[in-house]
């Protein structure tokens, strides 16, 4: 019996979940937000209770100390040594990491070097890893990479149609992201369908603030929508998704506020997508409220969002030469029935049909009609559990 913490650290946040392993029982979960800012918020949920504190938390090391002290203070653990492993979500593993690994100094250095592939994510993950290693140096730390699942893509899929020297010299290629989520929901879909994963062709749609769609052939990723960075693919909450790359130098020439490529990429990452087009929010709930009010910018943002997702799903039907099921997961994928309805409404030619009585908020499972040739599933993702499982598997290999 051991306890494992799954960590998802961002630049100013640290989301966590504590498991009793190998039973896979969730003992507590929480999030520390606004790290490095005034009025940081630490939230802990356990035994049906919710504790919230407003603090000044200056960095990730301080955040980890507060998290561990809270676990003792609220009686969730009696001592630090009850924790035998920590698993960290890392977005970009590049070509270096094809599977989860135990952290050492070299691994941490490589994660920091790979920040160029995920500038919004890897630096925060590295800070979280460093903090846990400083405070709990004797326990096993494991990195679980979003990109690992996509290392099964063929070369003709992951290479861009540019001179090959940019791949050879600079490793410019498609890496993908959200791999842990795509892997988990594909496994769960196979259970739900009562068929071996090795026989299935699945399209998995992770639709949250970040959006990625993956073509899964017999349990392996054969294509995915995110690319060299998580900026590629369909429209997202604050990210543009795919655009004509010639727009970048054009905007630098035209807009004095955009001084260089970094400014444009920052705009595409943080000020675009649903938020940028609507001028309202990156949250689909706010966009849907705008639809009810006939707000033209909300309508436009919503229509672009649906259009881009439909196109991406459609191309993966071609990649797989048909599919057995389409899986919706993540925040919007699980909780936005209107979005699911409108996406499927544009894909009926592929043989999909959903039951409106099942396509409602809170429902999980098969939402397709009995006649639907392609099953439509809503499955809650559980990246934290995948991380905890990998820690359990690797903690004795240090």
UniProtKB/Swiss-Prot annotation:
Subcellular localization, as worded in the UniProt entry: Cytoplasm
GO CC aspect terms: cytoplasm
One GO process term, biological-process aspect: acetate metabolic process
Entries under CDD domains matching the protein: ASKHA_NBD_AcK_PK (cd24010)
Protein keywords: ATP-binding, Cytoplasm, Kinase, Magnesium, Metal-binding, Nucleotide-binding, Transferase
GO MF entries: acetate kinase activity; ATP binding; magnesium ion binding
Protein EC: 2.7.2.1
Residues under site feature: Transition state stabilizer: 178, 239
Gene3D superfamilies documented for this protein: 3.30.420.40
Cofactor: Mg(2+); Mn(2+)
InterPro entries: Ac/propionate_kinase (IPR004372), Aliphatic_acid_kin_short-chain (IPR000890), Aliphatic_acid_kinase_CS (IPR023865), ATPase_NBD (IPR043129)
Superkingdom classification of source: Bacteria
Catalytic activity line of the entry: acetate + ATP = acetyl phosphate + ADP
Pathway annotation from the record: Metabolic intermediate biosynthesis; acetyl-CoA biosynthesis; acetyl-CoA from acetate: step 1/2
Binding site for ATP: 15, 206-210, 283-285, 331-335
Pfam families: Acetate_kinase
Record has Ribonucleoprotein as a keyword: no
NCBIfam families: ackA
Family: Belongs to the acetokinase family.
Assembly mode: Homodimer.
Descriptive protein name: Acetate kinase
């Amino acid at each position: 019996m051991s306890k494992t913490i799954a960590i998802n650290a961002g630049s100013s946040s640290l989301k966590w979940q504590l498991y009793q392993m190998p039973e896979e029982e969730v003992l507590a979960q929480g999030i520390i937000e606004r790290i490095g800012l005034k009025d940081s918020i630490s939230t802990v949920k356990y035994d049906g209770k919710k504790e919230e504190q407003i603090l000044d938390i200056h960095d990730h090391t301080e955040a980890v100390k507060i998290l561990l002290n809270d676990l003792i203070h609220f009686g969730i653990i009696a001592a630090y040594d009850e924790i035998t492993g920590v698993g960290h979500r890392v977005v970009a593993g590049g070509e270096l990491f094809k599977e989860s690994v135990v952290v050492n100094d070299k691994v941490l250095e490589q994660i920091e070097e790979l920040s160029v592939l995920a500038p919004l994510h890897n630096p925060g993950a590295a800070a979280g890893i460093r903090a846990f290693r400083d405070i709990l140096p004797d326990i096993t730390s494991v990195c679980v990479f979003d990109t690992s699942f996509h290392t099964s893509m063929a070369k003709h899929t992951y290479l861009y149609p540019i001179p090959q020297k940019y791949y050879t010299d600079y490793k410019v290629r498609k890496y993908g992201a959200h791999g842990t989520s795509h892997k988990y929901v594909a496994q769960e879909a196979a259970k739900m369908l009562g068929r071996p994963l090795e026989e299935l062709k699945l399209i998995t749609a992770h639709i949250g603030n970040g959006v990625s769609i993956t073509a899964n052939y017999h349990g392996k990723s054969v294509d995915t929508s995110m690319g060299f960075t998580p900026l590629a693919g369909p429209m997202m909450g604050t990210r543009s998704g795919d655009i004509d790359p010639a727009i970048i130098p054009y905007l630098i020439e035209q807009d004095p506020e955009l001084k260089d490529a970094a400014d444009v990429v920052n705009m595409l990452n943080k000020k675009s997508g649903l938020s940028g087009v609507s001028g309202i929010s990156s949250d689909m709930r706010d966009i849907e409220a705008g639809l009810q009010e006939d707000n033209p910018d909300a309508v436009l943002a919503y229509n672009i969002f649906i259009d881009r997702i439909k196109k991406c799903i459609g191309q993966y039907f071609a990649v797989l030469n048909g599919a057995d099921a389409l899986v919706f997961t993540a925040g919007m994928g699980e909780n936005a029935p209107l979005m699911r309805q409108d996406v499927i409404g544009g894909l009926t030619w592929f043989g999909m049909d959903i039951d409106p009585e099942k396509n409602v908020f809170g429902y999980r499972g098969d939402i397709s009609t009995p006649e639907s040739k392609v099953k439509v599933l809503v499955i809650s993702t559980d990246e934290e559990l995948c991380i905890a499982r990998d820690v359990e598997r690797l903690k004795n290999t240090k």
